[in-house]
From Swiss-Prot:
Amino-acid biosynthesis listed as a keyword: no
Tagged with keyword Cell membrane: no
Organism listed in the record: Nocardia farcinica (strain IFM 10152)
Cellular compartments per GO CC: cytoplasm; ribonucleoprotein complex; ribosome
Purpose: This protein binds to 23S rRNA in the presence of protein L20.
Transmembrane segments: none
Gene Ontology molecular function, alphabetical: rRNA binding; structural constituent of ribosome
One Gene Ontology term from the biological process aspect of the record: translation
Family statement: Belongs to the bacterial ribosomal protein bL21 family.
Protein name (record): Large ribosomal subunit protein bL21
Domain of life of the organism encoding this protein: Bacteria
PROSITE patterns given in the database record: RIBOSOMAL_L21
Assembly and binders: Part of the 50S ribosomal subunit. Contacts protein L20.
Record key words, sorted: Ribonucleoprotein, Ribosomal protein, RNA-binding, rRNA-binding
């Protein structure tokens, strides 16, 4: 069984294994920088770790690959009979991480 971890970043949880590319909410940093994420759960073969004391000793390291943006979301506000309408767009900033190790 492969080793994987559940990490929490940006208010969301992601299942990651070594070598995975993951798009997460924006993390400040330059491409090539090392990022350390705290795991919520670690599975190493048949061994499952969820206790806070044991997880404090574990860490997930990742390399920041690039800063990018998500797909465009279009917002249109409209009020009937007044001629009011407003168009707006939004692209969420994202960070692409490559998981390099689970310790």
């Amino acid at each position: 069984m492969a080793t994987y971890a559940i990490v929490k970043t940006g208010g969301k949880q992601y299942k990651v294994a070594v070598g995975d590319l993951v798009k997460v909410e924006k993390i400040e940093g330059e491409p090539g920088a090392a990022v350390e994420l705290s795991p919520v759960l670690v599975v190493d073969g048949a061994e499952l770790t969820t206790e806070a004391e044991a997880l404090a000793k574990r860490s997930v390291t990742a390399e920041l690959v690039e800063q990018t943006k998500g797909p465009k979301i279009r917002i249109h506000k409209f009020k009937n009979k007044t001629g009011y309408h407003k168009r707006q767009g939004h692209r969420q900033p994202l960070t692409v991480l490559k998981v390099t190790g689970i310790k």
